[in-house]
Regions:
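Beta-strand-rich binding/interaction modules
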Residues: 587-607
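Loop/helix patches that line or flank the sugar-binding groove of alpha-linked glycan CAZymes
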Residues: 17-18, 301-303, 315, 320-323, ...
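An active-site-proximal structural segment forming one wall of the substrate-binding cleft
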Residues: 248-270
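C-terminal beta-strand-rich structural cap/linker in extracellular carbohydrate-active enzymes
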Residues: 614-628
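Acidic/aromatic-lined carbohydrate-recognition and catalytic surfaces
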Residues: 3-250, 264, 275-322, 456
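Conserved alpha/beta catalytic core and glycan-binding cleft of carbohydrate-active enzymes
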Residues: 117, 123-124, 133, 141-146, ...
Length: 628
């Protein structure tokens, strides 16, 4: 296997990602259209114009597939059926169509590593008689039926009956004649089963005594989530199948057919849950999981070249090799040790409290941006040389909302940065109005995450803040009952609100080629002993992606860089380099304007009255500026 794989030579990254600005929606908490207390797809469709007008042109919808909801939909019972509480498959198709008319793209949330224990695959796989471990499926939906070996591959691929070229007649394969209407397939090895009811999991979490099958089964997370079988890196027991072996490839093909099902109906791609966890006992660097994804992408990309895939992986050197278009800078903190992203917004062991928070954007922390850059820049470099994107989030469904511990002014500075950095920005629903985390009892396996999943707050003059007309006791989760709970209506009406600041930043990002996801990024100022952070973004057109500067220098003087002329954007207009600068602290900071910035550069966006005198930008306390 090559040490570095780029699928872009055969299939470029989806063109629309260069200008993508994502909005993450937790469907059960966004908008309820039928009054049952749970958000649904029609409610989301009715609010697509709101998301577009906010400045986002792409959606990530958390799982909306049929599920018993023991883990909020990350326990899938049927990958090709919308959960009835959200609506129907037709409702989701209508959402795709309406989004596309608005110039928006939609990513679904794919959970490839496990299913619900109620999935028909698992129900069949758990039967005691091996001959009964089969499922019957429509021939145009799923199922591997024959082994073929593509040119250049030593492992067989499993052909899919989804291929329309195969429909319309009976197919004779190495496994017999298959009727066009439905076929049966064995799912005995669709999951990872040991060979005895007393067997343990070889270091992996396992469940025994729950089924009639003589064996225990491996789980990924909760008890209700049996792991799908993508094989083992180094099998050492008979029940452990090899990665990319026939059993693992059959699982790959089943998941490919899930992708095909929704992509053919209008989805524009997938955010992939726990993308790095497919192959068990994988080596450092995840080489077998990487090869598995390379195989999957080798099949799906020729069919859907504009489909985008973002990994929940968090290590772009690996995810880019695997073939993903995007990775997230995930928010992690282990035993008091923050990662770079955590240093920005949640650098504390008591995340609900402002005091003692050493986050960069806490005005009183006194911390520098340099430690963040030390971790961020090498990972950005990994993405850039693979022509992928490394995405920053404001928050997501798994993290605590930042508005609980940062003030509105601190959030404005933070979002100014997060929405102008390289990669595609991901805005979590409600963050634009400063929705707060609320300590709540666990719901559907949410535990501490539950408080970040509360209903969207639309209008204080409407029942349940406009989320639903259902009785309050019927709501999926309670709305914020505080008298000062922010709503879209209240924040839109307040000129200096966080909501209007986010709209301004996103509007500028929409207009400026220098703020595209693939525009060049160069650090200008990041002193170890200061609070200022400044960087220049240069439109990517006309030059190959280049490496950002990798030093967080101890002085605030700009690092040297070649002077650049205006660069033409996609529509033939000119796009100038932009300087983005911020001071989240309490003192005054200065930045020397870099040579790339035109002498006639103007202040395009400002917070806190920054000023320019000659070639010096002065940033008062808690200020932010974009010049270009």
């Amino acid at each position: 296997m090559s040490s570095r794989v780029r699928h872009a030579e055969a299939s470029p990254r989806p063109s629309w990602l260069s200008s993508a600005r994502f909005y993450e929606v937790y469907p059960q908490s966004f908008a309820d259209s039928n009054g049952d207390g749970i958000g649904d797809l029609r409610g989301l469709t009715n609010h697509l114009s709101y998301i577009r007008d906010l400045g986002c042109n792409a959606l990530w919808i958390n799982p909306c597939f049929d599920s018993p909801f023991k883990d909020a939909g990350y326990d899938v019972r049927d990958y090709t059926k919308v959960a009835p509480r959200y609506g129907t498959n037709d409702d989701l198709t209508a959402l795709f169509e309406h989004a596309h008319t608005l110039g928006m793209h939609v990513l679904l949330d794919l959970v490839p590593g496990h299913t619900s224990e109620e999935h028909p695959w698992f129900q069949a796989s758990s039967r005691p008689d091996p001959t009964e471990r089969v499922t019957t499926v429509d021939a145009d939906r799923t199922l591997p039926v024959e082994s073929v070996t593509p040119v250049g591959q030593t492992t067989p691929r499993i052909a899919s009956l989804f291929d329309p070229r195969r429909r319309g007649s009976d197919c004779e394969t190495s496994r017999g004649v298959v009727q066009e209407s439905a076929i049966q397939e064995s799912v005995s090895d669709r999951y990872i089963w040991t060979d005895s009811w007393i067997s343990r999991g070889d270091g992996l979490p396992f469940i025994g005594g729950e089924t009639e099958r003589d064996g225990t089964y491996i789980i990924n997370f909760f008890k209700c989530q049996p792991a799908l079988n993508y094989g083992f890196a180094h099998p050492k027991h008979p029940w452990q199948k090899p990665a990319l072996g026939p059993e693992a490839l059959a699982t790959c093909e089943a998941m490919l057919d899930v992708m095909r099902f929704w992509l053919s109906r209008g989805a524009d791609g997938f955010r992939v849950d726990m993308a790095d966890s497919l192959v068990k006992h994988d080596d450092d660097g995840k080489p077998f999981t990487i090869r598995t994804w390379q195989y999957i992408f080798s099949q799906i990309r020729p069919e859907f070249p504009e489909a985008a895939f973002v990994a929940e992986w968090g290590r772009p050197y690996e995810s880019m090799q695997a073939g993903f278009d995007m990775d997230f800078y995930l928010d992690w903190r282990w035993d008091g040790h923050p990662n770079g992203y955590n240093m920005l917004l949640r650098n504390t062991d008591t995340p609900l409290e402002h005091e003692g928070d050493a986050s960069y954007f806490n005005a009183d922390s006194g911390t520098s941006i340099a430690p963040f850059l030390e971790q961020y820049l090498p990972q950005l470099h990994d993405c850039e040389r693979a022509s992928g994107t490394f995405n920053l989030i404001t928050c997501n469904h798994d993290t605590l909302r930042t508005a609980q511990r940062l003030t509105e002014r601190e959030l404005k500075v933070a979002y100014g940065m997060l929405l102008t950095m390289p990669g595609c920005p991901f805005l979590y629903y409600g963050d634009e109005i400063g929705m707060r985390y609320r300590p709540l009892p666990t719901k559907e396996g949410g535990y501490v995450r539950t408080g970040s999943r509360t209903p969207m707050q639309w209008d204080a003059d409407k029942p349940n803040l406009g989320f639903s007309c259902a009785p309050s006791e019927s709501l999926y989760l309670p709305v914020d009952s505080a008298a000062d709970a922010p709503t879209v209506a209240s924040e839109a009406a307040r000129e200096d609100s966080l909501f209007n600041w986010v709209r301004e930043v996103l509007a500028l990002r929409t207009e400026q080629p220098a703020l595209a996801s693939d525009a060049r990024f160069d650090v200008v100022a990041a002193p170890v002993d200061g609070r200022v952070f400044a960087y220049i973004r240069t439109p990517a057109e006309g030059h190959a992606p280049t490496h950002p500067r990798t030093t967080a220098d101890s002085s605030s003087a700009p690092a040297p860089a070649a002077t650049r002329d205006d660069v033409s954007d996609r529509n033939g207009a000119t796009g100038r380099p932009l300087l983005i600068a911020m001071n989240p602290g309490r003192g005054i900071e200065t930045v020397e304007l870099p040579s790339e910035l035109r002498p006639d550069a103007s202040m395009l966006l400002a917070l806190g009255s920054p000023t320019v005198s000659g070639r010096t930008l002065t940033l008062p306390a808690q200020s932010f500026a974009i010049l270009g």
